[in-house]
Amino acid sequence: MTSAPRPRPTLDDLPLREDLRGKSPYGASQLAVPVRLSTNENPHPPTQALVDDVVRSVGEAAVDLHRYPDRDAVALRTDLANYLTAQTGTRIGFENVWAANGSNEILQQLLQAFGGPGRTAIGFVPSYSMHPIISDGTHTEWVETARADGFGLDIDAAIAVVSDRRPDVVFITSPNNPTGQSVSLTELRRLLDVVPGILIVDEAYGEFSSQPSAVGLIEEYPTRVVVTRTMSKAFAFAGGRLGYLVATPALIDALLLVRLPYHLSSVTQVAARAALRHAQDTLGSVATLIAERERVSKKLASMGFRVIPSDANFVLFGEFADAPAAWQRYLDQGVLIRDVGIPGYLRATTGLADENDAFLRASARIAATDLAPAAASPVGAP
């Protein structure tokens, strides 16, 4: 006699940490649709020369796959330092650079070292949703304060809350995801003058920004500023999962205390180095994407949408009577964009010209039925 199958266990059956119960994992929808404009990747595929270089480099590394990789990734960090020196105009050495599996691992290591029980991190929302998730995962108290109307950073309000709360970690995302605005060096200096711990400037979209990189502030504020970046956006290397930071060498010494051993595989290291060798060709698409972003923004505004001015490779736009319903209407027309949880707004990645055209055609139809009554306003209007 066959016994009845046991029911499959659920999370409720597991001895999960109580602070994780009821929470949802991070992640954008990954759907097979004709137009995918939801995760802010560079839509331009790698050149054949880059593909060939990656294949050759991985093949050469494969003969040593029975050995652990260079745990400090010195060659990769040297290449990243050379790229940053050329891109930002600030002299950077390999000892100022640290790399990991995407910038999220970088952020996690930072909070493992500088956050934790009894410590506080502050962010200005809406902003990158992984900041509070990583804070929770490291038992760092998360405090959030709202951005100004129009989603810009109110620097005076930021200074006031940092002065009052005295957090151990402050997050500034520039350009901000999901709203798109950059923060000037003048504003960052004002904030750094009152930050008691460290300021993490998240520059995941830094190559698109009209503002200079905050790496120029590291020499001036060596114990207080760290800049995080990624190769997943402008660098068209999202599948390679490579993030990095720039800071004073002592801060990197602190991360060595919490990083996992051999965290960055030899395959990842050589593939990322190959991508860096082709940086000039890959980043040639940045100007094209900026021009497309501006074209899309103007078209959306002409349809009656409110478009938040962006310094990244995406636009936040609205105002919808029901943003989740509007998101579904885009999907029904074969266009996947992102509902980032801001009431009345959706975010669209800047894609290839034909992808943007498909998005705009869908937007024209949706504008006729889904906009809130007071939505029509010029680009950037508050």
From Swiss-Prot:
Pathway: Amino-acid biosynthesis; L-histidine biosynthesis; L-histidine from 5-phospho-alpha-D-ribose 1-diphosphate: step 7/9
GO biological process: L-histidine biosynthetic process
Alphabetized Gene3D superfamilies for the sequence: Aspartate Aminotransferase, domain 1, Type I PLP-dependent aspartate aminotransferase-like (Major domain)
EC number, as in UniProt: 2.6.1.9
Cofactor(s) needed for function: pyridoxal 5'-phosphate
Record key words, sorted: Amino-acid biosynthesis, Aminotransferase, Histidine biosynthesis, Pyridoxal phosphate, Transferase
Molecular function, one GO term: histidinol-phosphate transaminase activity
CDD domains from the UniProt entry: AAT_like (cd00609)
Listed InterPro entries: Aminotrans_II_pyridoxalP_BS (IPR001917), Aminotransferase_I/II_large (IPR004839), HisP_aminotrans (IPR005861), PyrdxlP-dep_Trfase (IPR015424), PyrdxlP-dep_Trfase_major (IPR015421), PyrdxlP-dep_Trfase_small (IPR015422)
Catalytic activity: L-histidinol phosphate + 2-oxoglutarate = 3-(imidazol-4-yl)-2-oxopropyl phosphate + L-glutamate
Chain positions covered by the region annotation Disordered: 1-24
Pfam families reported in the protein's UniProt record: Aminotran_1_2
HAMAP family: HisC_aminotrans_2
Quaternary structure and partners: Homodimer.
Protein name, per record: Histidinol-phosphate aminotransferase
Source species: Mycobacterium ulcerans (strain Agy99)
Gene that encodes it: hisC
